[in-house]
Amino acid sequence: MKFPSLLSLGVAASTTIVAAVPDQKPIGDIIEDVHLGKFLIELGPGDTRWVTEEEKWGLRRDGRRFFDITAEAGQGVFPKTFAQTTVTFPTELQNVAHVKKLASSLSKNRLQTFLTKFTSFYTRYYKSESGRQSAIWLFEQIEKTIQESSATEARVEKFEHPWGQFSIIATIPGQTNKTVVVGAHQDSINLLMPSILPAPGADDDGSGTATILEALRVLLKSEAVTQGKAPNTVEFHWYSAEEAGLLGSQAVFAQYKQDNRDVKSMLQQDMTGYSKGTTNAGHADSVGIITDFVDEGLTNFIKKVVTGYCGISYVLTKCGYACSDHASASRYGYPSAFVIESKFEYSSKLIHSTRDEVSSLDFDHMLQHAKMTLGLVYELAFADL
């Protein structure tokens, strides 16, 4: 039996959503399933099943996305459901001149230099040693970016997980604890043999990782931001283990909900670098704004941001249930949105393989995502949310 989803299609920010809890297994049976190496996944609202790890990867190879909610099952009640936070987003851009001046400092060369190194790790698979080493290197780059700015109160922290690769959170404090979040996932995967084969992950999601880091670097050039004059706090997140069922982002937002964090928005940047699918199909270059399982108010404001700050337009597209880390934010009641490189059917088909390399990317296109990210973060940092 299926029940209404926590992430109802096209939900408005003002809508309160309640999802029913499916039939529960006895806790002893759950412990036994975990002991046998099984994982509880949620493929859609109310659609849960226990699977082996190989079955998880088989579903991913078939294009299915899901939450891995095994940790919730271990607590005896799943899935957890939360009412959506109500947020009124701006109706117009308020900082165009300042944002455009900042955006002129965004660098394609920096994006390419970063990705050349980031994709040189054998794999960024979340349980691998090279996946942990890539996270350490990424943390150092973020730390250096903050140190080279005048933001004395900004900080970067590791969010540890039971597996090897940690998530990373960079924070720029504002005048309140109201928080604007931008995220990407740092892990990669080769779905043929995840723990053995290389996975450069240039587009998925090295591109998003680089995009938001470059946006952070340029945002820190704003004295108003670095001096803590923005009304709202800004965070940049790099999640671990997205490919395994949004594990890292679920852990982060579960902790935020437990701590009563006041997250006003979350934008995910996952796959920001591939444009050939669009242009080879005879269409003008554009970014893809996801419209399913997202916050309607935030998504509508992002349309204005793209129009105001990017040199290309947008198309509306869908990606399905639990298709990236923004879904974890929504799962815990926080307004979220997702912008991808193109209409979903034109996105890169090279991902999850050895062929997802830097040579396939369009850095001019990535720069447009960086402009959008910078514009959104700056506008919302200074908005009355």
Swiss-Prot record:
Keyword vocabulary terms for this entry: Aminopeptidase, Disulfide bond, Glycoprotein, Hydrolase, Metal-binding, Protease, Secreted, Signal, Zinc, Zymogen
Propeptide: 21-87
Top enzyme category: hydrolase
Residues holding Zn(2+) 2: D204, E243, H352
EC number of this enzyme: 3.4.11.-
SS bond list: C319-C323
Entry GO MF terms: aminopeptidase activity; metal ion binding; metalloexopeptidase activity
Quaternary structure, from the entry: Monomer.
Function: Extracellular aminopeptidase that allows assimilation of proteinaceous substrates.
Protein name: Leucine aminopeptidase 1
The organism of origin for this protein: Ajellomyces capsulatus (strain G186AR / H82 / ATCC MYA-2454 / RMSCC 2432) (Darling's disease fungus)
Lineage: Eukaryota, Fungi, Dikarya, Ascomycota, Pezizomycotina
Gene that this sequence comes from: LAP1
